[in-house]
Amino acid sequence: MSTTAHTEPSWADLPFLDFTDPNFSWDSPEVAEAREKSWIARTPLALLVLRYAEADQLARDKRLISGFRGLVDMVGTPEGPVRDFMVDFLQSLDGADHRRLRGLATHPFTPRRITAVQPFVRSTVEQLIDKLPQGDFDFVQHFPHPLPALVMCQLLGFPLEDYDTVGRLSIETNLGLALSNDQDILVKVEQGLGRMFDYLVAAIEKRKVEPGDDLTSDIVRAFHDGVLDDYELRTLVATVLVAGYETTNHQLALAMYDFAQHPDQWMKIKENPELAPQAVEEVLRWSPTLPVTATRVAAEDFEVNGVRIPTGTPVFMCAHVAHRDPRVFADADRFDITVKREAPSIAFGGGPHFCLGTALARLELTEAVAALATRLDPPQIAGEITWRHELGVAGPDALPLRFGAA
């Protein structure tokens, strides 16, 4: 990319943003100025789409294919189990293999299954609120961690008592998708992958002899039908688990952080719980847990709005910045759950790689926000937050809260 950046004339006047800098902030004036100057910017890793219309368009553009495999090469992830998993992860695939495996992975996220799981989600939310400690506590460990883990156990047919193990295995595995070449992280991810696959193989073998009405059984049936092999079987179950857990976990934590900054918005939900779905959409717009929501690579030479994109160029869509685009969102820099935004969030990407768990994530977020706001006073920050800053999932790993006086 760096060589192309110096030789492609149409890039000469594009702004440059280094989002790999530890001190970088998506909310900085520098980023807003870059978006006003151009719809796209140069970065150390890729071209970065900053405006909503172009990000929405290019996330679905067939001239761009999944860029994840190229990113693995770019950051220099060494040969081994971590690299193997990342390049075989569903979001790394394109074409016939992607369509075949994605078709199987959609089973837990069909409208029928989402409707069927809603009572479980609602009752789980209420039970978790009942168990919240009094005073100051880490909200992540007591709510965003167990909720999606329990839901994924329910959908995959895993014992509910395994939720903590399942969630932590997902966290360890997802570190690999952060595209780090740090040896300590790679060792941790490799160990986590080993534990993850040990757990999944045991669950899969059980479903081979005792099938049920769950996703693991559905995928095992496809294995018996010869649609996928043993390696694809366990990798696909792992993909669904990671996709269904990690982003929901951090998005829930980000929602509470947002409402701690805007307690008046919390009170509006308390007074009118029917605002919860719209509040979730505003959270997704304001603080998407995937700031860079789609990573693509140009499969051919083409041009967009005067910018030439040569074959092989990585192109990233930045949901965080696009969601503050004043061309699309009125009062874009104001968090307001009462405003019905005309443009939908692009937090879940678009095109063939649109996030599988979108409907499930929205369900969990809506049920959680509605119940928490109805039963509790607005959240207040009660200590130092531990933030995760990476190319993939971002948000609080630890969020000390108290639900104080309204």
Swiss-Prot record:
In this record, what's one Pfam family?
p450
Q: Which GO terms describe its molecular function?
A: heme binding; iron ion binding; monooxygenase activity; oxidoreductase activity, acting on paired donors, with incorporation or reduction of molecular oxygen
Its catalytic activity?
luteothin + 4 reduced [2Fe-2S]-[ferredoxin] + 2 O2 + 4 H(+) = aureothin + 4 oxidized [2Fe-2S]-[ferredoxin] + 3 H2O
Biological process annotations from GO: antibiotic biosynthetic process
Signal peptide (UniProt feature, chain positions): none
Q: What happens when the gene is disrupted?
A: Inactivation of the gene yields a mutant that cannot produce aureothin. The mutant produces luteothin (also called deoxyaureothin), a metabolite that exhibits a significantly improved cytotoxicity against leukemia cells compared to aureothin.
Answer yes or no on keyword Metal-binding.
yes
Q: Where does heme b bind?
A: 98, 102, 296, 350, 353, 355
The membrane spanning regions, by residue number, are: none
List the PROSITE patterns hit by this protein, alphabetically.
CYTOCHROME_P450 (PS00086)
EC main group: oxidoreductase
The entry's stated outcome for residue 239 to F is: Exhibits a change in regioselectivity and is capable of C-9a hydroxylation
Q: Identify the CDD domains for this entry.
A: CYP_AurH-like
Q: In which pathway does it act?
A: Antibiotic biosynthesis; Polyketide biosynthesis
Mutagenesis or variant effect for residue 89 to W: Exhibits a change in regioselectivity and is capable of C-9a hydroxylation
Recite the UniProt keywords alphabetically: Antibiotic biosynthesis, Heme, Iron, Metal-binding, Monooxygenase, Oxidoreductase
So which cofactors does this thing need? heme b
Q: What is its EC number?
A: 1.14.15.37
Q: Which InterPro entries match?
A: Cyt_P450 (IPR001128), Cyt_P450_B (IPR002397), Cyt_P450_CS (IPR017972), Cyt_P450_sf (IPR036396)
- Tell me, how does this one assemble? Monomer.
State the family named in the UniProt similarity comment for this chain. Answer: Belongs to the cytochrome P450 family.
What role does it play?
Bifunctional cytochrome P450 protein involved in the biosynthesis of the antibiotic aureothin, a nitroaryl polyketide metabolite with antifungal, cytotoxic and insecticidal activities. Catalyzes the hydroxylation of luteothin (also called deoxyaureothin), leading to the formation of the intermediate (7R)-7-hydroxydeoxyaureothin, followed by the formation of the aureothin tetrahydrofuran ring, the final step in the biosynthesis of aureothin.
- Any notes on this protein's domains? The hydroxylated intermediate probably changes its conformation in the binding site due to a sterical switch of the enzyme, thus allowing the second oxygenation-heterocyclization step.
The name this protein carries in UniProt is: Luteothin monooxygenase
